[in-house]
Amino acid sequence: MVSMEVASRSGGAMTQLLRRSGPNAIRSTTVLSNNTRRNFSSARPLPPTYEKLYTKYTDVRRVLGKQRLTLAEKILYSHLDNPEDSLLNNTDNGRNIRGKANLRLKPDRVNMQDASAQMAILQFMSCNLAKPAIPASIHCDHLIVGSKGAEDDLSAGIQTNKEVFDFLESAARKYGMDFWPPGAGIIHQTVLENYALPGLMMLGTDSHSPNAGGLSTITIGVGGADAVEALVGAPWELKAPKILGVQLVGKLSNWASPKDVILRLAGHLTVRGGTGSIIEYFGEGVESLSATGMATICNMGAEVGATTSIFPYTKASARYLDSTRRSQANKNIEALEAFASNSSDPDARWQFKADEGAEYDELITIDLSTLEPHINGPFTPDLATPLSKFKEVVKEQDWPQVLSAGLIGSCTNSSYEDMTRVESLLKDAKKAGLKPAADFYITPGSEQIRATLERDGTLQTFQEAGGIVLSNACGPCIGQWKRQDGVEKGTSNAILTSYNRNFRGRNDGNPDTMNFLASPEIVTAMAFAGSTTFNPVTDSIKTPDGKDFMFSPPHGLEGPQTPFESGNAELGVLSQAPDPNTKIAISPTSERLAFLEPFAPFPSSDLSGLRVLVKVTGKCTTDTISAAGPWLKYKGHLPNISTNTLNTAINKETGEVNAAYDLDGSKHTIPELGQLWKERGQEWLVVAEHNYGEGSAREHAALQPRYLGARVVLTKSFARIHETNLKKQGVVPLTFENEADYDKIAAGDEVATVGLYEMLQNGGKGDVQLRVTKASGEEILIPTKHAVTKDQAGFILAGSALNLLSKGI
C-alpha cells in the first residue's frame, strides 16, 4: 500500500488519502457443494425479498467459491438473472470479474421522477403490457418552479403542468404503479423514507438515485429505456463495476458534516474518477454517521461518475428504519443474518457489510476527525476548496464577494439532522438580533420532513429568520427557479447552495451565476454575512448594536424524538392495483406530450455519407446536450424538446456558444442545423472531448440527437449513463484510440464507418474505424474504441432498445 499525503488546495487540513490498486477480491475458485442451498420450509421463515436474495446468494457462492466479496458485490451479484452465466463468461473462470463481466441483473423495483417518467411511460406503453413485471413508482418533483413560497409555487405548478400530471397519474392507475403527487416530495428523499431497504437493488431514472445507498441499497441511475427493460421483466445489463473503497476513520466534529466527506472526495477523484466503479464506504468512522448523512454522501457519488455508492447497515440505519415506521425491516434483517449464520459453510453466511479480507481496486482513507468544511465550485462539483482557504481563493480568482442568495435543502441535504443543525445557527443569530444578509431559501425534501419540522417548531424558526420555505420539490436545484431579486441574465453573481450539482447556468438559466456547493450549515452562516469571504469558524459579524457575533458550531438531532409526521394526507401516495379500464389520452395538438415513432433500424451495411454537425470543446454535460429548467415542460414531446439540443455547447473551431455552420457556410444554432439536416435526410455525428454526457441520467440527451439524425458520437471519453443511453437509442458511441486524432477531424467533414456493421453483426466483437474525407478531398483513417456488448449490438441493429422490447424480444 502506498500512502499519499495530499496537500493541494483541495487537500484541506491534511486529510490523509491512502490509495491502493490491486487485483479483484479473488482467492479461489473452489466450487462449493450443493449443500449450501437452504431448505426454507424447514427453517425460520424469511420474508420473500430476503429469501430470494439469500437463495441467489448461495448460487453466487457456488460459482465463486471462497472469494471474499464486498457488500456491493454481494447485493449486486445476488440480483443476477443467472449467476453462472454472468460470472463465468468473459472472465477467467470466475476470476477478474470486475470491469470485464457483463452482468444481467433483475432489479427489485424502478423509481421514476416526473420529468423522465414521461418518456419512460411512453416507451412502456409501446410494449403493450397490462402491468410492469416489478413494482414501480412515479414521483412528481421536477416540474414545480420555486419562487415566492410553497403554497403559491405548488398551486401554480399544478395548474401549469396539469396535462402532464394527469397523464402520469392515469398511467400509474392503468399499470398499478405508485403515484406520488406534486408536493409529496423529491424522489430520492421519498424513496429513502419508503422504499429503500438493505439488500435491495433498484433502478431510478435520475442520476442521484444512489442516494438510497445510505440504507445499504444498490440503486443505479438510468435512462428511461433502461427502466423499461426492467419494467417488462427483461434482464438489465451492466458491465461489472470495479469497487472503490473509502475507509472512514475518526469522527466528525464542529463544523464538519457528511456533505464535506463527498465534497472532499470529489476534489480528489474529479468528475471522472469514479467512472465504472461502485464506491463502498466502510471503517469505524461509518458508525458515527446518521443514515441520512450516509445518503447525502451516496447522493453525490454521481458527481464523480460512480455507478452507485453504498454504506453498510449500521445502528443508525436501524434507528432510521424505526423512525420511518419500518421496524419490521430490522426484524427481517436480523432473521436473514441469523438464518445465514446457521450455514455449515462460513462462506454462505450473510452480513450487510463486506467480507473480512475483501479487497478493493482502489482504497482511499479519510480521517473524519481532521476533515474541515469544503466549498466546491463554481461550474463544476470537483473544484474543492477547504473553508480555511476559500476567502483567499475568492480574492485570487476575482469571484464575486457579495453573496446574492443562500439555498439549503434539496434531495441532498434536507434531512431532519441537516435542518436541526441549521436551526441551532438560526437561534444563535436570533439572540444577536441578526437576519440573513442574502436571500435565504429552504427546500424540504418531502412532506414527511416538512410536516415533522413544522410539528417540532423548526419551520417556524426558519420563517422567523426571514427564510422562504419552498415546496417539497426540486425547484432551483434542477433549474426551476424564478428569482425575485432582480439578478438578470448576464449579471455575474454568487450563490451558495447545499445542492449536488453546479454546472454553468443550471440553477437560474444565467451562465454568469456562480453556484458554490457546501453543507447547509456553511450556506446558512455565510448567508447571514452576505459574503463569500466569510468564514464562520474564525470570523465575526457586527450585530445591530455594534458587537461582534460569532456562530457556535452547529448541533442537531439525528432524527425526531418521536416518529416522523406523515403530513398532509392529500400529498400521500396513491397505490393501487392495475386498472386496465383507465384511458390514457394524449391530444394530437399537445405541446407537452406526443406518442413516439419508432426509429429506423440500422442499415445492412456500414454507415456512409455522415457529416460532422459540430465539433465541441470543453465540458459537455447532459445539461449542455439537453437543458433542464424551462425545457422540462417538453420532456414528453420529443420534437419540441429537440429544439434545445446542444444549445450551450461551445464550438471548438469558432469559440462560439450554440453555433454551427452548414456546408454552404451559413450560420445556424446547433439545433437549427440539426433540424435542417434531418429534413434533408443528412445523417450526422458529433465530435467532443472528455466525459461527454457528464451529469444526469437524462435520456433526452441521447433521444434528441437520434431524433435529429445523429448516428455516431465520437469523443475522448464518455460518462457511463450517457454512453448506455446512446446505445439504447441506436446511436453508436465511439472513442478515439489516439486522443490526438481529435485535432484531425472538423465540422463538415464527411465520415464513413469501417467495420461497424460487421462488429454489430458479431455481437460487439471487432474493431471500428472512421474514414474521414476532408473538404480538400484528403482521406484519413481514424481508429476508434467501443464498449458495445452483445445485447447492445442488438439494440443498435434494431434501431433502438424499444424496437426490440416492444416485440417481446
Regions found by a protein language model. Name each.
Residues 1-47:
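N-terminal mitochondrial targeting presequence
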Residues 41-809:
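Fe-S-dependent hydro-lyases/dehydratases of central metabolism
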